[in-house]
Amino acid sequence: WQKVLDNLKPGDYVFIQFGHNDEKADPKRHTDPETTFADNLRRYVRETREKGGIPVLFNSVVRRCWFVEKEKNDDDEKLRTTTFDAEEKINSDTLVDTHGAYAIVPRKIAMEMNVIFVDATRITHDIESQLGAVESRKLHMWFLPGEVASIPKGRKDNTHYNVYGAHIVANALADAIAEQVPGLKKHVCHYDYVVSAIGRGNYLCLQDAVDAVKVGEKATILILGGNWKKPVHTEGKKIKLVKRWGANISRD
């Protein structure tokens, strides 16, 4: 936080979201929702304002939990390296809340301190619920053994998003931010495909993204950095290429 504060300039927006790790039993990470957790949020808001920044509070995105008795989860970080052990036992027809007071307190602090608030819990709850118990897996690092070459033993992580899920949630939250902060609306842009050679998009290769666009379809492709060959086979496709982070396209 001190690094953020040291670099904060008047007029900067500071997006503040905590909760997932505060819920853990580990005393090195745990905070109490009504005391230490709330006090930390107040501190971040207060110190942001003291530097001339504009705080925006979010509550936590939901976990994908369709279990009345949810699976034991001591540490979300461990899920990044776990392998697929068995099919899950879905026993709820509605998404089950795992955050409790940690999702409520940020809203209370926002009202108390007159801070802009984005309800990330509700937004992501709706996204997961609309997809349903099985289809919502495709948002997360949830892969069967052999489904993804780089994760041969599979993975069953209901907390962290894969690239597709991150893209869906980021789009939804960007729209929500624009609603709460009209001054930022002009900066919100949506893209159909994102290309990044270092894995920050849903395609590693520009040509692959172009090939994914159907003939007759309109598509906007964001290119994040890198040097790329001009794509071919674009006939009949209405493609707009947007370059960021020094991206360059050449004929060679």
For the regions a language model picked out, list residue spans one by one.
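Structural motif corresponding to alpha-helix initiation and N-cap regions
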Residues: 1-2, 203
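Acidic Gly/Asp/Thr-rich repetitive segments characteristic of extracellular carbohydrate-active
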Residues: 192-222, 227
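Alpha-helical cap/lid subdomain in secreted, periplasmic
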Residues: 3-167, 171-182
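A short acidic, often aromatic-flanked loop/helix-cap motif at beta-alpha or helix-coil junctions
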Residues: 123-127, 200-203, 247-249
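Short, flexible loop/turn segments with low-complexity composition
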Residues: 182-191
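Flexible, charged surface loops at secondary-structure boundaries
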Residues: 8-9, 212-217, 233-235
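N-terminal extracellular ligand-recognition/capping segment immediately after the signal peptide
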Residues: 218-251
